């Protein structure tokens, strides 16, 4: 977690430095003798995982207000008073990790963590916190409230999962009789009105003709996802043959999605384990019978999930890394 601290008094700055020694991050002083708060907030909201204000809660609220978008995108925001008495998560308590961070910071300076999320206050299963712990993206953040609201009202909720989930489901959580009856679902192929949690375990294998533009790749990718009902949030990186290292369109496409790119030689691609779609033409050009499937499997160190798909000179495939979800959702659980 990338942390950024800001304080407004000498006493607050000393506390920020103490906290940063335990939970590393940059430390700035705001006000007349330091950085402009608006500039600092704009920059850190875009580049940091957590913003920690040491000062009045009102200062923090006014500073972050113009930048708040959604619980799925916003960084964690925590505020501590300059005396180190209270640590209050203001934003992204679950998905952004602000609740956990507030508790960690409170332990450093012997403050009281003030956790205000209802599920935490009542000890109720927090589906968004569980999603974060299982390394899942939340496809529809606006649906979190339906699951949490039902549990807080004492109602049971039903889940569906495309993987076996080890352990015992939390109180109030039970398997759905059918996938279309689930209140939340662990899946890479979301359909229906449930809250969908998308495991971030997928690698996109890419093949393309020389000179393929980022726009053409984007169009192909959108069609690929639509045809397979595949959630793009599940992809964490992309992979191809080393002959594509200098393709500007491919590089721009991956940058737009914030994906790292792995490149493999033809010899390395031939070592991939599994059954792949063979092409004599691809073999004649690249030295290996398939690029997208083999590259995806190697980068994922896993198994092929969606086989080769081709359109307009672009080939795509998806492989999955190993995934073993469990029902733990709080850090104090074994």
Language-model-detected regions and their locations in the chain:
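Conserved beta-strand termini and adjacent loop/short-helix elements that scaffold enzyme active sites
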Residues: 29-32, 116-118, 264-266, 307
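Conserved mixed alpha/beta catalytic, RNA-binding, or beta-rich assembly cores of soluble enzyme
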Residues: 8, 12-18, 25, 34-36, ...
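Extreme N-terminal starter segment of soluble prokaryotic enzymes
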Residues: 1-5
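Long, charged alpha-helical interface segments
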Residues: 148-175, 274-296, 300-310, 319
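Conserved acetyl-CoA-binding loop-helix of GNAT-fold acetyltransferases
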Residues: 41
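C-terminal non-catalytic interaction/assembly regions of soluble proteins
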Residues: 237, 241-294, 300-304, 311-314
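A generic structural signal for short, non-catalytic loop/turn and secondary-structure boundary residues
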Residues: 72-73, 197, 299, 309-311
